[in-house]
């Protein structure tokens, strides 16, 4: 028989101290999570202020009552928050419209924060549907929301009379809006109150529909707390669940994912579900444990599926925007899952893009003839630039312009032998600050062409850089170009393709232009041949390469409102003086890349393709760098080793691929703003083949 001795005074004191410490930690952690609401609603108010009156005035402006002092966010953050909010809103609207106007529909916002979705939808639908909204969050936060609502006559008028409350469950109660304080980690309490909440005034509405929303709220809870919330919610009548949550399709070492995880960890509000459910496949499995049906799309899938073309065009008019790569990568790290017991699926296809791509690329073999390594001799900070122009020249590499915090006009010289990066002295005729321009090596000089200042302002000036490291301005282009492609044709000729403003004609004589530095003139080059059947379009950020006899073009954006990205591979040859034969030779989703770079290897038999961003898939360690056999058109993967992914993960946006000789190339510069999480930049990487 064992006996348990009583705790002495010191042990009791230590126990009390530990309990108090645990209590304080829980309060602190909860406050940090609630703090994410404050940052989020400032961004949402920025979107509301800019977008709502132009796009959807019928929704009203309700964030203004919760954000006394607004701040304007960057275009990329604004667009990111807009698609995040609009995706949830559109999904709720489509579920509402799939049901009879007489059916009672409860919209339960779990971890609602100060989100005014209820007020937007009440404003939008007026009395067309029998809608009721239940906002649930931490008791302290809900009290703050209640106080803010009391100060807004517009909200009080919208939600109707606040009579005497039918139950102490409610911090606030009207016929169509209730505010409830509940820490969702208190599962027993949530399970107890939920049936009462959704059955309130339910006698006339026995077949009520219940739509649960968790917009990055369960993400802050460990799965052992978050999943029971989903399970409990699935047990009420006609349940729909909509969750917006982060994923990591390329794992936690992906550059964007690393930045995202660090951001939330740094705020002391780590996201807790993403490492358990990092893929679309695992998120679907998670919800199919509790619901008969589940469907999923990432936010870019929602941008394509839920937002019609006219709306996409209208958005382009609101603020200047040229951050497609950053927007797409952000969208590929967030998903919306819709789960339900009802036969009311919204998306066109239950299988995800991720699943389709998984099947397509699972059989791709490795190309052991190409290897990537990290070259750590350089001061990476000096090369933290997006969309500079870079070229090799006389055993050095030269870098012009690009985007730091702002666009710059600096010239850098990289010595590959010593690893030293030198900033060159400013000279006369210096090209002004710019990005998205090109630098082409003609042997005895470099030619800099075009680029842009702010989005939509394309440059048409052209410069020559000589062995004395001096710039000379040449004749201007007929029209400005940005995100264009260039290749050397001879020691005095540069072929220029695409990069025309959207208002320019998308086909025709001006698409290809030959720059002659001897005559200081430009000659339009007309596409001929197969171009009648498969006309090449004006592409921005396409890849063009040339081996002296023939060349290839792939990728690039056709329509910058969507964008539509080209998946075709074109082969071209110059014919005579003013014609170019352009033939479509292949079409594949792995070629659908914005801002990819490439080299022609093995005497014209192989393409080495590096980076870029695809709207269809997030490129991974296995698909970022691939080779394409140009005889049988099969891809092989160039695997990025873990030692690079874990230490200096690359992000293939706004970078350059510079060939040093027929055996090696360098990946230099490039980076991206990762939504509101901060920026990440490339190191220097060497490719050997």
Curated annotation (Swiss-Prot):
Gene3D superfamilies listed in its UniProt record: Kelch-type beta propeller (2.120.10.80), Vaccinia Virus protein VP39 (3.40.50.150)
One Pfam family linked to the record: LCM
Gene Ontology molecular function terms on file: tRNA methyltransferase activity
Region annotated Disordered, chain positions: 1-33
Name of the protein: tRNA wybutosine-synthesizing protein 4
Name of the gene this protein is made from: PPM2
Pathway assigned to this chain's UniProt record: tRNA modification; wybutosine-tRNA(Phe) biosynthesis
Bias (Basic residues) ranges: 14-26
Residues that, per the record, bind S-adenosyl-L-methionine: 84, 111, 137, 183-184, 215
GO biological process, one term: wybutosine biosynthetic process
Coiled coil: none
InterPro entries: Kelch-typ_b-propeller, Kelch_1, Ppm1/Ppm2/Tcmp, SAM-dependent_MTases_sf
Main function: Probable S-adenosyl-L-methionine-dependent methyltransferase that acts as a component of the wybutosine biosynthesis pathway. Wybutosine is a hyper modified guanosine with a tricyclic base found at the 3'-position adjacent to the anticodon of eukaryotic phenylalanine tRNA. May methylate the carboxyl group of leucine residues to form alpha-leucine ester residues.
Reaction(s) the record says it catalyses: 7-[(3S)-3-amino-3-carboxypropyl]wyosine(37) in tRNA(Phe) + S-adenosyl-L-methionine = 7-[(3S)-(3-amino-3-methoxycarbonyl)propyl]wyosine(37) in tRNA(Phe) + S-adenosyl-L-homocysteine; 7-[(3S)-(3-amino-3-methoxycarbonyl)propyl]wyosine(37) in tRNA(Phe) + S-adenosyl-L-methionine + CO2 = wybutosine(37) in tRNA(Phe) + S-adenosyl-L-homocysteine + 2 H(+)
Keyword field: Methyltransferase, S-adenosyl-L-methionine, Transferase, tRNA processing
UniProt EC number: 2.1.1.290, 2.3.1.231
Protein family membership: Belongs to the methyltransferase superfamily. LCMT family.
């Amino acid at each position: 028989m064992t006996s348990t001795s009583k705790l002495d005074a010191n042990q009791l004191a230590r126990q009390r101290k530990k309990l108090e410490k645990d209590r304080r930690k829980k309060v602190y952690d909860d406050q940090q999570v609630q703090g994410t609401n404050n940052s989020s609603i400032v961004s949402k108010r920025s979107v509301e202020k800019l977008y709502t009156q132009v796009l959807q005035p019928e929704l009203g402006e309700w964030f203004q009552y919760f954000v006394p002092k607004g701040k304007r966010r960057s275009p990329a953050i604004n667009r990111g928050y807009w698609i995040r909010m609009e995706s949830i809103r559109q999904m709720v609207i489509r579920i509402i419209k799939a049901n009879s106007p007489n059916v009672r529909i409860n919209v339960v916002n779990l971890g609602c924060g100060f989100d005014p979705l209820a007020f937007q939808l009440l404003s939008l639908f007026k009395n067309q549907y029998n809608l009721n909204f239940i906002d649930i969050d931490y008791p302290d936060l809900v009290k703050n929301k209640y106080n803010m609502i009391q100060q807004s006559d517009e909200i009080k008028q919208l939600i109707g009379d606040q009579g005497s409350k039918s139950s102490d469950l409610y911090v606030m109660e009207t016929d169509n809006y209730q505010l409830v304080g509940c820490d969702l980690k208190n599962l027993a309490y949530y399970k107890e109150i939920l049936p009462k909440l959704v059955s309130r005034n339910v006698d006339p509405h026995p077949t009520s529909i219940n739509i649960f929303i968790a917009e990055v709220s369960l993400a802050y809870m460990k799965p052992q707390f978050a999943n029971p919330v989903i399970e409990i919610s699935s047990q009420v009548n006609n349940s729909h669940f909509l969750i917006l949550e982060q994923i990591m399709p390329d794992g936690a070492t992906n550059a964007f994912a690393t930045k995202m995880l660090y951001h939330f960890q740094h705020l002391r509000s780590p996201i807790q579900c993403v490492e358990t459910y990092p893929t679309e496949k695992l998120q679907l499995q998670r919800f199919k444990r509790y619901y008969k049906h589940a469907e999923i799309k990432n936010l870019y899938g929602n941008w394509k599926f839920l937002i019609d073309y006219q709306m996409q065009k209208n958005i382009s008019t609101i603020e200047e925007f040229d951050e497609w790569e950053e927007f797409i990568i952000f969208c590929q790290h967030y998903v919306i899952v819709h789960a339900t017991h009802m036969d009311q699926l919204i998306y066109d296809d239950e299988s995800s893009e991720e699943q389709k791509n998984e099947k397509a690329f699972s059989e791709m073999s490795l190309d052991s003839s190409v290897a990537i390594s990290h070259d750590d001799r350089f001061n990476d900070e000096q090369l933290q630039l997006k969309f500079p122009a870079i070229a090799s020249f006389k055993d050095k590499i030269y870098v012009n312009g690009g985007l730091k915090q702002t666009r710059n006009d600096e010239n850098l010289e990289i010595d590959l032998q010593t690893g030293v990066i030198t900033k060159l002295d400013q000279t006369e005729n210096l090209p002004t600050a710019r990005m998205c321009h090109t630098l082409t090596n003609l042997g005895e000089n470099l030619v800099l062409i075009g680029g842009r200042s702010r989005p939509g302002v394309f440059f048409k000036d052209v410069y020559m850089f000589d062995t004395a490291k001096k710039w000379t301005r040449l004749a201007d282009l007929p029209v400005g170009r940005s995100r264009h492609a260039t290749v050397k044709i001879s020691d005095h000729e540069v072929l220029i393709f695409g990069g025309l403003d959207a208002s320019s004609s998308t086909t025709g004589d001006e698409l290809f232009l030959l720059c002659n530095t001897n005559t200081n003139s430009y000659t339009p080059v007309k596409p001929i041949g197969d171009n009648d059947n498969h006309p090449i379009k004006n592409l921005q950020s396409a890849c063009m390469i040339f081996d002296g006899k023939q060349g290839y073009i792939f990728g690039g954006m056709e329509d910058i409102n969507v964008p539509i990205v080209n998946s075709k591979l074109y082969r071209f040859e110059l014919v005579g003086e003013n014609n170019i034969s352009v033939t479509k030779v292949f079409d594949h989703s792995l070629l659908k890349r914005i801002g990819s770079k490439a080299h022609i290897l093995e005497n014209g038999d192989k393409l080495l393709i590096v980076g870029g961003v695809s709207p269809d898939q997030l490129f991974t360690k296995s698909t970022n760098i691939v080779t394409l056999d140009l005889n049988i058109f099969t891809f092989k993967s160039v695997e990025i080793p873990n030692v690079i992914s874990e230490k200096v993960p690359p992000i293939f946006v706004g970078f350059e691929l510079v060939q040093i000789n027929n055996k090696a190339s360098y990946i230099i510069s490039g980076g991206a703003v990762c939504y509101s999480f901060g920026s990440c930049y490339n190191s220097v990487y060497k490719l050997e083949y």
